[in-house]
Amino acid sequence: ANGAMISTETGGAMTYALWNLQERGSLFISPQTEVYEGMIIGESARNVDMDVNPLKNKKLTAIRSSGNDEAMRLTPPREMTLEEALEWINDDELVEITPDSIRLRKKGLKPHERRQYYRERVSDEVK
C-alpha cells in the first residue's frame, strides 16, 4: 500500500505546486480545487505519508510572468468512486462525501494529531 500526500494548507491548489508534486505520486485533485489541512490530495509513490503544500506558487520575476504556465502539463487527477475511496483508505483516514465530491482526509487534520495516532497504534502493536 502506498502512502498519502496530505495537504498542510487551506485554500485553492496551484498548478505550479501540483506540477512539482506529480513527480512524487498520483494526484487526486486538479488546480483551483479547494483543499484544507489534513485533506489527502494524492497517493505517494512511496509507502509513507507525505505532508505537502499544494498552494505553493512560482516566484514571478519582473519579465517572465505567468505566460510560462502553459508549459506545465499536469497528468489528469485520479477520480475515485465511493467504493474505490473506501478501499483505498487506512484506519486513520476517512472518506468525506458531499453532493459534489468524494474527498479523502486524515482523522487527525493536524500533523501532531496524526503523529499521536501513529504512536498509539505502534504502542498497541508492541503490547
Regions found by a protein language model. Give the residues of each.
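Accessory interaction regions appended to the cores of large information-processing enzymes
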Residues: 1-127
